[in-house]
Amino acid sequence: MILDLRDDPGGLLNGAVGVSAAFLPEGAKVVSTKGRDGKDGMSLSALPKDYIFSGHADPLKGLPSEVKNIPVTVLINSGSASASEIVSGALQDHKRAVIVGTQSFGKGSVQTVLPLSNGSAIKLTTSLYYTPNDRSIQAQGIVPDVEVKDKNRTYESREADLAGHIGNPLGGEEVNGVVHDDAVEEKAASQADKEAAKGKNKGKDKEKEAEEELSSRHNPDPAKDAQLKAALDLVKDPAKWRESLGLAAKKPAKKDKKETTKEDK
């Protein structure tokens, strides 16, 4: 099974816990929080009630063990944030899934909305999320077990790029976004106004490639999606899948460096 969480900006916490619970043993820790003082906050564990519709029976109960334990891969990229990082982190820490793609966004903060009398509200950061192995993803993100870059993605934006962002409380290396070489070259060529006609055709080609790449998300095509192909190859090879479980824990986070043009320098 493949969970495609690329460009998933997140959602409700209970939804993330529910998705995680569908793949983890009952009672397994999914996520916890800590405040500024470092004291433990809430801790949420995997329970059937988290994914069962009210009044319905457990759809996973009674399934053969071989079905419950099928290989799972999770696809992530720099657009995977918040709740999608909670799911990725939980399945990664429990070695239930192999994470494939590129480093996630790094949005590990908990916000509380405080309504005001005039109808507006203030969103206040009150704590940070931690994975089952007590990792903070804040400004660092989830490191994939198997890194596969997306050749069609020319720019990566992450939490660490935001001015005034909260740093990683565990001292983890912050991971910034990156402008890939081809994007920089295209910008420089445009500024210099060189080979206008050729550049125009190249721009159309890139637009076509981007449209095809977006379309492949809705109509999955491994031939055009290297990350999806890597995920498929893993689930088709159980031995390789098992070897890849937890690989990210054995390597440090990679810090992407922004490329700059000569004018920027």
PLM features: what roles do these ranges have?
Residues 1-265:
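C-terminal "post-core" interaction segments
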